[in-house]
């Protein structure tokens, strides 16, 4: 929420300094990003330690670098039968508008190239809830792979007729700062008003793309 409000301030009044920190909105954001970088390194270390403990308990979370041909063939068949029919691929070009990306949504994004050399952007929502996120891999240990890893690996099967130049998984975090008091109308039912506020928060500008 705080970062969202600072981004708004940076656009509207970028040279105004905060009376508590003595910093402009841009300077505060830079300080926050420096602190967040340290927190992210700490988060990654904690995650790796937790995954080691889970592995010691006989449960593994893997990607395609850690499986054999037999497991890879099974996952391809699983993708074709259980995931591919349920995904909704989007192609973005000059005539196709960029879609709205949901807050905290996970998306497989690819740069597509046609035979004539023209590029387009391909997007696939990966956590729509229509298929399980954890896919079990046949192995001696209890082994799983994330559905988004599966989608990204086989994404060329979805966008047939294109060459995949680059691909990645992204997640968008949207601004959660909204002034409810400024928007409140006494003639509205308060419950309906708050429902509208919550819906509006989900469509505010992005503050982070991972």
How would you label these PLM feature ranges?
Residues 1-210:
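N-terminal non-catalytic structural scaffold regions of very large proteins
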């Amino acid at each position: 929420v705080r970062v969202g409000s600072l981004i708004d301030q940076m656009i509207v009044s970028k040279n105004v300094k905060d009376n508590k920190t003595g910093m402009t909105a841009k300077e505060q954001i830079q300080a926050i990003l420096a602190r967040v970088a340290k927190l992210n390194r700490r988060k990654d270390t904690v995650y790796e330690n937790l995954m080691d403990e889970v592995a010691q308990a006989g449960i593994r979370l893997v990607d395609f670098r850690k499986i054999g041909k037999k497991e890879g063939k099974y996952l391809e068949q699983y993708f074709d039968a259980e995931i591919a029919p349920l995904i909704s691929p989007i192609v973005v070009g000059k005539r196709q508008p960029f879609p709205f990306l949901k807050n905290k949504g996970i998306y497989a994004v690819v740069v597509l190239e046609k035979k004539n050399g023209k590029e387009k952007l391909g997007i696939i929502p990966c956590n729509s809830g229509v298929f399980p996120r954890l896919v079990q891999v046949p192995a001696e240990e209890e082994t799983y792979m994330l559905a988004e890893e599966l989608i990204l690996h086989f994404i060329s099967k979805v966008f047939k007729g294109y060459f995949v130049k680059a691909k990645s998984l992204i997640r968008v975090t949207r601004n959660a700062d909204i002034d409810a008091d400024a928007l409140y109308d006494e003639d509205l039912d308060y419950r309906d008003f708050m429902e509208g506020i919550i819906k509006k928060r989900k469509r505010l500008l992005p503050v982070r793309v991972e």
